[in-house]
């Protein structure tokens, strides 16, 4: 293991605590603003509590990016310890968080490398975990960057949400489209393209949208759909997680399934009831 490389990510990546502890990864949190109070994402409020509030109250959550000061503090700490820093960021197109890190890097002497996953939530977290595995194997930063670039060309990630309300609030869809969609019980199928959330399809009802999402993924994969690993992202709907697990086992026959909980800052823009799958093209 290359003990001199310190991996840092932001809370947009939704890396679970087991991975953070296993690979000694530091997280720079974004800020969630809920009912007039500020919370550090993943520190001051857990996803389970957050989604409960969303379902039970008429809450209007907002988020703010991680700041220059946050990155300067953590970069200072580890460069003074003689560490080489590898910061793996959530999509720079979706938030100014990565730019905050770039500005902090300019003002600090030391070896700091920044990799933009161009993705969000478990799509970004997956890159963090893969990088950590490679660093543990003794790979160099250059080798890690090359491997991550190759992964970018091969992965397929799609997800769906329970309600269109939060996408409307975030300006992802129009008020008219949200109103019609809610009336007809239309659920969107989404992906992260060029760092931003975009719609790839839709279906009526929860059951239909999951099946449609799987069909869209299979189309992307082509003939060879069996997988060594499948990554499942979910928010607060454990039944949906189990349903996705059953379907993933049946369709993709993976040797391993890993789970990521969609955190509060992503959840503020997606709402509760998120479910998604990440797989790979051969």
Regions found by a protein language model. Give the residues of each.
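Class I S-adenosyl-L-methionine
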Residues: 38-107
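N-terminal glycine-rich anion-binding loop in soluble enzyme alpha/beta folds
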Residues: 5-65
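Mixed-charge interfacial surface used for oligomerization/domain docking
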Residues: 3-6, 11-26, 31, 93-113, ...
């Amino acid at each position: 293991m290359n003990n001199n490389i310190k991996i840092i990510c932001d809370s947009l990546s939704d890396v679970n605590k087991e991975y953070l502890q296993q690979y000694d990864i530091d997280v720079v949190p974004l800020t969630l603003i809920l009912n007039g109070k500020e919370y550090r994402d993943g520190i001051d409020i857990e996803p389970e509590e957050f989604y409960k509030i969303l379902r039970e109250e008429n809450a209007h959550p907002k988020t703010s990016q991680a700041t220059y000061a946050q990155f300067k503090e953590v970069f200072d700490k580890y460069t003074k310890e003689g560490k080489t820093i590898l910061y793996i960021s959530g999509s720079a197109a979706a938030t100014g968080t990565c730019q905050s890190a770039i500005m902090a890097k300019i003002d600090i002497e030391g070896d700091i490398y920044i990799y933009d996953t161009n993705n969000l939530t478990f799509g970004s977290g997956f890159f963090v975990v893969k990088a950590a595995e490679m660093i543990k194997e003794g790979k160099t930063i250059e080798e890690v960057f090359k491997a991550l670039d190759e992964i970018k060309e091969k992965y397929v990630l799609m997800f769906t949400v329970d309600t269109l309300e939060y996408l409307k609030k975030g300006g992802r869809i129009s008020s008219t489209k949200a109103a019609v969609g809610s009336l007809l019980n239309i659920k969107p199928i989404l992906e992260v393209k060029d760092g931003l959330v975009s719609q790839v399809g839709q279906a009526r009802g929860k059951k239909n949208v999951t099946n449609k999402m799987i069909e869209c993924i299979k189309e992307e994969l082509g003939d060879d759909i069996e997988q060594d690993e499948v990554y499942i992202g979910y928010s607060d709907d454990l039944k949906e997680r189990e349903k996705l697990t059953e379907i993933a086992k049946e369709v993709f026959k993976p040797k391993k399934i890993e789970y990521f909980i969609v955190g509060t800052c992503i959840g503020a823009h997606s709402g509760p009831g998120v479910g998604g799958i990440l797989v790979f093209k051969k």
